[in-house]
Design a protein with these regions (language model features):
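Basic- and aromatic-enriched surface patches that contact anionic nucleotides/nucleic acids
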Residues: 1-7, 11, 24-158
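N-terminal intrinsically disordered, low-complexity segments enriched in P/E/S/T
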Residues: 13-15
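A short, charged helix-loop
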Residues: 18-19, 158
Length: 158
């Protein structure tokens, strides 16, 4: 397995949504609350740091990437970009700009640009076997709230 770091703006990740598998077999489904999604978007709009995303490079005809770690964050970004939910009703201004209770489509152009150009830190895994990816997934999730059954399902051969 080869691992390398990369950085891509959100706009690039948005364009690759159809080529990205957010839920390979070892992943759990979407579980983030609206409040968690809103906090992530607020963090991005304030240009604060978020954890890196781990993606497995695949070439299976359907997808180019599988999400190893960061699925919940990636889904939240995609959904906000499609204006499927709004920022928090009590979100504080970003600079002089009010952002409370706004969908992406309602943001002023400068904040749309800021959101779209926000750099996501990626770790790309190339030539990784399913066993290697599942092992990495378990290790990355070790400190999170994965349930015992989810952890068992992620183990190779389960």
């Amino acid at each position: 397995m080869k691992r390398y770091s990369d950085s891509k703006p959100i706009s690039s990740i948005i364009r690759r949504e159809e080529k990205t598998d957010p839920k390979p077999e070892y992943q759990r489904g979407p579980v983030w609350s609206k409040k968690q999604k809103q906090l992530l978007i607020d963090t991005i709009l304030r240009d604060l740091d978020i954890p890196k995303f781990y993606l497995r490079a695949v070439n299976n005809g359907n997808y180019e990437w599988e999400v190893v770690d960061g699925q919940q964050r990636l889904r939240a970004i995609w959904e906000f970009r499609r204006s499927e939910y709004k920022t928090s009703k009590d979100a504080e201004s970003v600079g002089e700009t009010e952002i409370a209770n706004l969908a992406y489509s309602d943001l002023p152009e400068d904040l749309k640009d800021k959101f779209d150009s926000y750099a996501l830190n990626l770790v790309i895994l190339e030539n990784a076997t399913l066993d290697e990816v599942e092992e990495m997934f378990v290790r990355l999730q070790n400190g999170s709230t994965l349930k015992a059954a989810e952890r068992r399902n992620a183990l190779p051969g389960k």
